[in-house]
Swiss-Prot record:
Classification via NCBIfam families: PRK13694.1
UniProt-recorded name of the protein: UPF0335 protein CC_3319
Source species: Caulobacter vibrioides (strain ATCC 19089 / CIP 103742 / CB 15)
Entry-linked InterPro entries: GapR-like, GapR-like_DNA-bd
Lineage of source species: Bacteria, Pseudomonadati, Pseudomonadota, Alphaproteobacteria, Caulobacterales
UniProt GO MF annotations: DNA binding
S-S pairs: none
Family: Belongs to the UPF0335 family.
């Protein structure tokens, strides 16, 4: 069975190997950038908290602003319906 194994260097030609290496390196660089951005976001939320803002609510506002307006309105209407049905509003 080992005789039938393809040596790893023969699996991809040199062009494909170069492309694969380039892709992997780009992803790795982006992962580093993502970590740096996440740290910056964390610092902004810490600053907001220091200024007396509720970070949990701020995160919710950011999440809501990302949503499509029509989809958000539909979800809000369904939420209101469900809350009304159980006597919460």
């Amino acid at each position: 069975m080992a005789d039938d194994a393809i040596p790893h260097t023969d699996v991809l030609n040199s062009t494909a190997q170069g492309q694969l290496k380039s892709i992997i390196e780009r992803v790795e660089r982006l992962e580093v950038e993502k970590a740096e951005i996440m740290e910056q976001i964390k610092e902004v939320y810490a600053e907001a908290k220091g200024n007396g803002f509720d970070v949990k609510v701020l995160k919710k506002v950011v999440r809501i602003r990302k949503q499509d307006r029509a989809k958000r309105q539909e979800e809000d209407a369904i939420l209101d319906l469900y809350l009304s049905a159980i006597g919460e509003i």
